């Protein structure tokens, strides 16, 4: 069961910044205490969270970018639940 509201607009948590780390070729979350390296799919999801687009819109954009990926919606929702639990998003 997913607890993320598809009509909600999410954004990065306070004090976090999403950036690209060219030396490691990955997205990273920067915060006052350090850095979190993200896998590619986490970076793609987080870069779409602008505080205005709904979760449903983010999923639609990802589905357009990556057509025919089975379980994409469920995977995105599961990731967002984890990200919210870690206070990466609000």
From Swiss-Prot:
Any GO molecular function: quinone binding
Superkingdom assignment: Bacteria
Pathway: Cofactor biosynthesis; pyrroloquinoline quinone biosynthesis
Any one GO BP annotation for this protein: pyrroloquinoline quinone biosynthetic process
Signal peptide start-end: none
Gene3D superfamilies, sorted: Coenzyme PQQ synthesis protein D (PqqD)
Keywords from the named record: PQQ biosynthesis
One Pfam family here: PqqD
Function description: Functions as a PqqA binding protein and presents PqqA to PqqE, in the pyrroloquinoline quinone (PQQ) biosynthetic pathway.
Subunit structure: Monomer. Interacts with PqqE.
Sequence similarity: Belongs to the PqqD family.
Protein name according to UniProt: PqqA binding protein 2
